[in-house]
């Protein structure tokens, strides 16, 4: 195997060996032997040995109920260890620096070599960099927080073992620690006992900030500064921090009745409390380090006689006292106590920034730049990135909730039923009320619980410290009145500033109408005055793909963005496109660099705002070094997209995409919506029903408890198909459409699109990634074990379709095998398959036993149920995504 991966393979093998020793110590030699036999059979089966494949199936089918859980846990834990080794490999000196900060240097050199770009243009593009990452809880990190922490510790051990100068006794110590951590993981229950609450999810987000981003962001800025100095002779200004973090945890109430106004209020306080806690740690360090005496007259004037002997320390101690007073007040508020605000309560970033920056300027002026640019600079940058709120919150709610609230208000006032009015009448009413000086809400009126909740949420926004709430996102937005309605409700709550309100267009029809909706809004004078030249629009990836299939959805997303960019440019509006991508391909996920460069020209000029979801947060920001790599990749992609924009697609390419879109959507919906066998097949061939039992996120899996595929959220829909390895939502319809266009004699045109148009080549690359993870024999095995014989023909049809799709994509890409241009990912999938395959076979067996017990009216066997949950978590680790 490729030399490049030998370090990764040896780490994986070493971790596997330690896990084996742990299993032997815990359960005895016979269980370890059983696990080893299964592993060897799986490896041989993967290499094409049919006899061993049959033996693998028989061995797993014959496991007793007592053996199920240990075997499932062994393979699941191994995959977590393999993922940890892989994450370390991506940042280790021996790894393929697939995500190394070097990427910025490469991009800057590439830009400097462009004849029509000069240093001043590149510098201007750097100064306008803006990257906002929005952390969301779903599709939900399936791995428990306690295990994530242990994985981080294991990563540190691998780092120490990589040091060639390590002494033997130190190596023994590190190995002992590694054994302890793997044993701790083995003896920890990997499945949560209950669903996390929205507050638990928010705390998980804060833990990511504390354990990784807090150190990762300043490190990234140092790296960026170094590369800019080296390549452009340009230093980043101290107050320039192009990256910020926002969270949906505790703010996203779309379809989640557990996120209430009170929860949002609580999470806002908790977030501020965590910020004071982290800044206090920074200030403790600065109090200890800034013992210098020399200071500028300005600083001495600031500290007065009292602080003249140690001016920096004096200022830091005063700031520490303010932070402590703020923290105490926040603690009391979190306990429900109403206390008067203390003098000096920290509510704005400037209050933190000013004393720190005064110290920085004085140190620089007194020739102590080396000290100024140490811990102090890192803290200043954290103030700019995180500040008093730590992370800002987005509020998200579905459009119909606002319509229903206004309907209830208008009916009470006796002026008609807002819900039944035409769009023109709704707009006329909303604009009249927005311009009116009198309040709309009647006094002493008792609204329904749902309406009260909507109004209370608006009140929380109005009362929150300015800057702690980033935007109000309206899901399932369809009309201009959906946006105006939110502005009116916020006005009624007494909001004193222009809150960005972002419509989220997420079905195929809504994406196609997005430009019309925004054009109508921008033609309203009142609205133009309110937004002051800035507009945010969110593009939904997951629901549009679930609605129409990935090919039609991705083309609709591209066209919607393209039209919005042109409309806003013409109107002189600065547009920020907010990308609601998922981690998986079926929900719009793609390697960051490729995905950004495949967007329409101009789409990143207003900066990048993108959701980072669930388990992807750990893969991309789980460690400070990985954070540096991920932020560097985003930075280089934004610079490249803005300075070397992709070409406008030729008209003939657009026509082909229109054709592909129509055929793929018809094919996709023909199966998913119109084939009467499809829903029963889906329910039996995947663990969709069992997934509902997994205590994953705080959000219910369905928008409506009854109903078919359309009522399922995009996440369980993808998750279920990922589990049985058919990966259906991520490819269905795409290959059929490509095949039809090839048959029409346009293969050479498709090849040109693949070569010269990043949008199209990224689509094909994403299909290849999905095909690499899909597995025909496993999908077939699920059918044989779980599906009624009458439905077998449908399963066979879908698998045949998948096989044909793979051939057509390889033909267009001119490749002999999948992932030819990304060997690192192919290697990674190959490495994990040996461990994922037994989990898939075992899962099918467990689903069979579990359903049989249910059919017989017996109570479920807890050993089977627990082992099933472990296989679901294990396959998710093997596939590197949940939904």
From Swiss-Prot:
NCBIfam families: PRK00009.1 (NF000584)
Pfam families: PEPcase (PF00311)
Free-text function comment from the UniProt entry: Forms oxaloacetate, a four-carbon dicarboxylic acid source for the tricarboxylic acid cycle.
Name of protein: Phosphoenolpyruvate carboxylase
Signal peptide annotation: none
Molecular-function annotations in GO: magnesium ion binding; phosphoenolpyruvate carboxylase activity
GO CC terms, sorted: cytosol
A Gene Ontology BP annotation from the UniProt entry: tricarboxylic acid cycle
Catalytic-site annotation from UniProt: 138, 546
Record field: catalytic activity: oxaloacetate + phosphate = phosphoenolpyruvate + hydrogencarbonate
Alphabetical UniProt keywords: Carbon dioxide fixation, Lyase, Magnesium
EC annotation from Swiss-Prot or TrEMBL: 4.1.1.31
Cofactor (UniProt): Mg(2+)
Top-level division of the source organism's lineage: Bacteria
Membership in a protein family: Belongs to the PEPCase type 1 family.
């Amino acid at each position: 195997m490729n030399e490049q991966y030998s370090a990764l393979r040896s780490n994986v093998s070493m971790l596997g060996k330690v896990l084996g020793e742990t299993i032997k110590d815990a359960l005895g030699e016979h269980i370890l032997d059983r696990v080893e036999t299964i592993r060897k059979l799986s490896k041989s089966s993967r290499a094409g040995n049919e006899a061993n494949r049959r033996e693998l199936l028989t061995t797993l089918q014959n496991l007793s109920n007592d053996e199920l859980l240990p075997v499932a846990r062994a393979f699941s834990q191994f995959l977590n260890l393999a993922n940890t080794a892989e994450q370390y490999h991506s940042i280790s000196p021996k790894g393929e620096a697939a995500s190394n900060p070097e990427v910025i240097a490469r991009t800057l050199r590439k830009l400097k070599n462009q004849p029509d770009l000069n240093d001043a243009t590149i510098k201007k593009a750097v100064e306008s960099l803006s990257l906002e990452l929005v952390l969301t809880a779903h599709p939900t990190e399936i791995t428990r927080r306690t295990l994530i922490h242990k994985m981080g510790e294991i990563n540190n051990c691998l780092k120490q073992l990589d040091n060639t100068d390590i002494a033997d006794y130190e190596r023994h110590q590190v190995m002992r620690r590694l054994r302890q951590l793997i044993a701790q993981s083995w003896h920890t229950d990997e499945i949560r006992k209950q669903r996390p609450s929205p507050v638990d999810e928010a705390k998980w987000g804060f833990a990511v900030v504390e354990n990784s981003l807090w150190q990762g962001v300043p490190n990234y800025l140092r790296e960026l500064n170094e590369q800019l100095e080296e390549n452009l002779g340009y230093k980043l200004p101290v107050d320039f921090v192009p990256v910020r973090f926002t969270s949906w945890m505790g703010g996203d109430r779309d379809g989640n009745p557990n996120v209430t106004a009170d929860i949002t209020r609580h999470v806002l306080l908790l977030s501020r409390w965590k910020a004071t806690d982290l800044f206090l740690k920074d200030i403790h360090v600065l109090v200890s380090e800034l013992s210098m005496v020399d200071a500028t007259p300005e600083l001495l004037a600031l500290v007065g006689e009292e602080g003249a002997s140690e001016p920096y320390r004096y200022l830091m101690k005063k700031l520490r006292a303010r932070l402590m007073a703020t923290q105490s007040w926040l603690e009391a508020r979190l306990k429900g106590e109403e206390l008067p605000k203390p003098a000096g309560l920290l509510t704005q970033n400037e209050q933190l920034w000013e004393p720190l920056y005064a110290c920085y300027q004085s140190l620089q002026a007194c020739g102590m730049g080396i000290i100024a640019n140490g811990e102090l600079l890192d803290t200043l940058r954290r103030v700019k990135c995180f500040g008093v709120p730590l992370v800002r919150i987005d509020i998200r709610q579905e459009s119909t909730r606002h319509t229903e609230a206004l309907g209830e208000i208008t009916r009470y006032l006796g002026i008609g039923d807002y819900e039944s009015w035409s769009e023109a009448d709704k707009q006329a009413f909303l604009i009249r009320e927005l311009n009116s000086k009198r309040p709309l809400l009647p006094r002493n009126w008792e609204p329904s619980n749902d309406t009260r909740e909507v109004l209370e949420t608006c009140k929380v926004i109005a009362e929150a410290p300015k800057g702690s709430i980033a935007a109000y996102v309206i899901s399932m937005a369809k009309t201009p009145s959906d946006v105006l309605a939110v502005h009116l409700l916020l006005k009624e709550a007494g909001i004193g500033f222009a809150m960005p309100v972002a419509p989220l267009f997420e079905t195929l029809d809504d994406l196609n109408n997005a430009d019309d909706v925004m054009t109508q809004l921008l033609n309203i004078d009142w609205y133009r005055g309110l937004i002051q030249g800035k507009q945010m629009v969110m593009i939904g990836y997951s629901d549009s793909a679930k609605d129409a299939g990935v090919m039609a959805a991705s083309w609709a997303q591209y066209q919607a963005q393209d039209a919005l960019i042109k409309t806003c440019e013409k109107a002189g509006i600065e547009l920020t496109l907010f990308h609601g991508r998922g981690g998986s391909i079926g929900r719009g996920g793609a390697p960051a660099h490729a995905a950004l460069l495949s967007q329409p020209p101009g789409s990143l000029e207003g900066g990048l705002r993108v959701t980072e979801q669930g388990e992807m947060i750990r893969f991309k920001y789980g460690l400070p070094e990985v954070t540096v790599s991920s932020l560097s990749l985003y930075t280089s992609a934004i610079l490249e997209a803005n300075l070397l924009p992709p070409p406008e697609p030729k008209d003939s390419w657009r026509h082909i995409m229109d054709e592909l879109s129509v055929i793929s959507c018809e094919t996709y919906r023909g199966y998913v919506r119109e084939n009467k066998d499809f829903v029963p097949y889906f329910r039996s061939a995947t663990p969709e029903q069992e997934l509902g039992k997994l205590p994953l996120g705080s959000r219910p899996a369905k928008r409506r408890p009854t109903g078919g595929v359309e009522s399922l959220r995009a996440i369980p829909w993808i998750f279920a198909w990922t589990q049985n390895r058919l990966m259906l939502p991520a490819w269905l319809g795409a290959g059929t459409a490509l095949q039809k266009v090839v048959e029409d004699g346009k293969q050479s045109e498709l090849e040109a699109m693949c070569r010269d148009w990043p949008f199209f080549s990224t689509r094909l690359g994403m299909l290849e990634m999905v095909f690499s993870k899909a597995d025909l024999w496993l999908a077939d095995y699920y059918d044989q074990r779980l599906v009624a014989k009458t439905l077998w023909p449908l399963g066979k049809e879908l698998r045949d379709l998948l096989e044909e799709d793979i051939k057509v994509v390889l033909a267009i890409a001119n490749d002999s095998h999948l992932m030819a241009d990304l060997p690192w990912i192919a290697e990674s999938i190959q490495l994990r398959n040996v461990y994922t395959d037994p989990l898939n076979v075992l899962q099918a067996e467990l689903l069979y036993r579990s359903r049989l017990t249910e059919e017989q009216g017996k109570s479920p066997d807890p050993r089977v149920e627990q082992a099933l949950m472990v296989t679901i978590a294990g396959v998710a680790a093997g596939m590197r995504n949940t939904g």
